[in-house]
A protein has these predicted regions:
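Hydrophobic membrane-insertion alpha-helices, especially the h-region
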Residues: 12-31
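Intrinsic low-complexity/disordered segments
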Residues: 9, 38-41, 120
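N-terminal Lys/Arg-rich, disordered targeting/topogenic segments
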Residues: 1-10
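Alpha-helical segments in soluble extracytoplasmic regions
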Residues: 46-174
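Ser/Thr/Pro/Gly-rich low-complexity linker/stalk segments immediately outside membranes or between
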Residues: 30-49
């Protein structure tokens, strides 16, 4: 009987350990802590995929808005229509900025992402001031909008340089 009793106790110990381990893992997930099974290289790849996707989305929004400005310049839209169009594009920039803020960003890419978000914010503000210029005709607003757009490009290029430098470093290590 004692061997059956020992087997029964051993079985219950194993079940108890499995239950406790499962509860521990469940508590970690409930508390919002993540158990990372990915490697730093996987995290870098995920960030780069997200970053390049963000850049593509941004380019699409910027190109579409620039096309609308072209139509306005040709007289296809009046000023009020262009103001409305600009107002419809501003939330798209907000969405891009929010999207970037939700990235799981490795530390080595954080400064580059911050610069890119700064670029998006400057481009958004430029479009906002351009809208105000259309409404008021104030050349100062147009000049400030142009300066902000120039800054947005500068921040974007700096961001790309930082990402490319980190990416090149990863290629030489890996």
């Amino acid at each position: 009987m004692s061997s059956v009793s020992n087997s029964y106790k051993e079985f219950h110990r194993i079940i108890l350990v499995i239950i406790l381990a499962s509860v521990g893992i469940l508590i970690l997930f409930i508390n919002g802590d993540n158990i990372s099974l990915s490697t730093p290289e996987d995290e870098d790849r995920e960030f780069l995929n997200n970053f390049y996707s963000l850049v593509n989305d941004t380019n699409q929004v910027s190109q579409n808005y620039d096309d609308e400005i072209g139509r306005w310049k040709k007289g296809e839209y009046d000023n009020q229509q262009m103001v409305s169009i600009t107002n419809s594009y501003l939330p798209q920039y907000d969405h891009l900025i929010a999207n970037a803020s939700n990235f799981n960003t490795p530390e080595k890419f954080q400064s580059a992402l911050n610069l890119y978000v700064k670029s998006l914010s400057a481009e958004r503000k430029s479009n906002e001031l351009f809208r105000d210029f259309i409404e008021t005709g104030s050349p100062d607003l147009n000049e400030t909008a142009t300066d902000l757009l120039s800054n947005a490009s500068k921040f974007e290029f700096e961001s790309f340089a930082m990402v490319n430098a980190q990416n090149d470093a990863l290629k030489t290590v890996g």
